[in-house]
Every structure is written in structure tokens, then in C-alpha cells.
């Protein structure tokens, strides 16, 4: 850098200033639009807050800086190259660029040749667009941009997660159909990290957060061996991923679920060989580095609906409901899943109910009340007693 504030703080290339907070967030609140970038950065390298040992990020010792460059992305990429950036996370998606896709691809290729590993979520457009345009720019760029699709906690594909392949038929690129995405990560029911360092359960959905998991994994790998190039990273992370869908590479989850532990071990194994050291302790499988997919899915058949973010002055707030409370029933119907909620709400409409009985649980305490038809005033999330990883 040149010693100016952007070296550590980042830069807004659209406004040509250092303002990266475009939407203010009041203390004690969560604004999904305002904190989208904050959450992405937290997933990559968040370290929690003072006095709280909980580390939120995948690579908590990594350093990050932000850029805003919707209109001047070339300047942002050039700046990242000059700053010596290792990886560059892009949780946005642009449709319908036509021939201009070639320009994006060329810029990303140049950045990749300069050593930057570009990462993006696969997009959230499976229910809105057809293949091969579910994945848009930049996640549709081959080789230079790595895309992460999304799975739920039970490893089923998230319905909105965009699928490949993509297609390239421009004046400059004639690849035809190209396999995408590269891998997948969790993208549904993720915890929120608030500005004060506290967390709220299961409040985030979207491939905007699968991409940063990919980016964090790459940062972790680079901490083990900073000399790796983008194509090395891609080969290692795809070869160590855990297959969670159709056998082999597929258009929904790519090579499979990112396995950070195995990826870093493979990095250390290759590094040991390159340095003429014994790679033995990094070779082979270990207990805990393999997922028992069938066993975990069986345990995850039992779920509950927990309260995520509570809307101020909404029906749930007026009843005194807090994040973490469990919705037991709605309209006298048991609610243990999102589908249960949908069925119960449809039945309430069919019954033309003017008042709907709701039951919540907070520990041993039961909270009963009545809702009017309409928004419940909280974001429901699915929780399980079993951890995903053992």
C-alpha cells in the first residue's frame, strides 16, 4: 500500500471515498441489507468480540478489507492486486450482461494470474430462471471465479440454490456448456452475528453466505501455505470435498461439501513433499474427517421451529417472544418444520380463523397466546439437537 487509509480500511470506488457504511444500523438491531457485507466478512475471518471466546469466522486470524465497486469493478480489482490480496469474495450476482460478460471474465482472469482467488456464491435463482442462466456474473466465469452452491443442514440441496452448467457463447469465448458450481457449503438457517458480538440462531439464508465459506476455507489453506496459486487451491479443495449428492461431480453441488480439515491437511502434505520433509503425518484418513451422511440425515429427521429475529412491535414481540423460543403449535397444529407452519397457516385461512392460538416454549415455561392472521412477527428457523459434525 501507500500508507493511506484505504490500505487498512478499504475504499468505495463508486463514491471515490472511504465510506463503506451506506446504511446505518442502530445499536441492538439487525438490518439484513445493511449488514450483508458485515456477515460475509464475519463468516470469512470473524473473531467475535472482546471477552467472548467464540470465533465466528473460518479463518479468524485472516485480515480483511472491503470495497464497494458496482460501477468501477476494474479499479477495485486493480487495487486488490496492488494490495497483495490473496482472495476476493463477491456475494452479488448480475444478470443479462450479454457480450459484457467477456469483459468481466477477462478482468477476473487477469486478477487470477496475479494470484487472487476469486470466490462467489452460486446465486439464488433456481426457482426463477432456467439452466444455463441460473448462475449469473461473476459466478458463471470458468476457472478464474470459484462458485459455491448451497445445501441445508441435512445435506439436501437448498431449493433456491442456482444450478449449473453455465454457457459461454460470446465473441471472445466459445466454451459452450461449462460445469458449475465447483463445491457447496451451508447456506440456510445460519446464525446472525450482531455488531456487539452476540449471535442469534438461524437467521440467514442464501448463497451470499456459501461463497464466504468457500473464501474462508481458501484463506485457511493459504495460512498453511501462502505460496499456493488459485489453480492449486481449486484442485485441492475440490479433490477433498465430501460428495453429498449424485456420485461424482454434479450440477447442483459440484464436487461436494467443502471439507476444511481435509483440505488443509492436503495443503500441508504437499508442502512437506515440496520442502523434502516427511509427509506421513498428513497422509491418510483420520477419525472425524469423514461425514456419516446417512447417519446424520437420520438424526436430523427430528427438528423444532425456533424463533430467529423478532420484528419490533410485531405480534410475536407483543406476546413477549424472544429469539430462541420454540414454536410448539399454530392453530392447534404441531409445528416442527417449515412445512408444518405452512400447512397450519393454510388451514387457518381455510377455517377463516379470526384469532389463531399459538403456543411457544422457553425452557420449561409454556407461553400461550393468540395471533391475528398475517405476519407472525418473527423469522422461524429449524433447529436440531444433534450437531452436524462429530
Describe each region flagged by the PLM.
Residues 40, 88, 217, 316, ...:
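Terminal peptide-recognition signature
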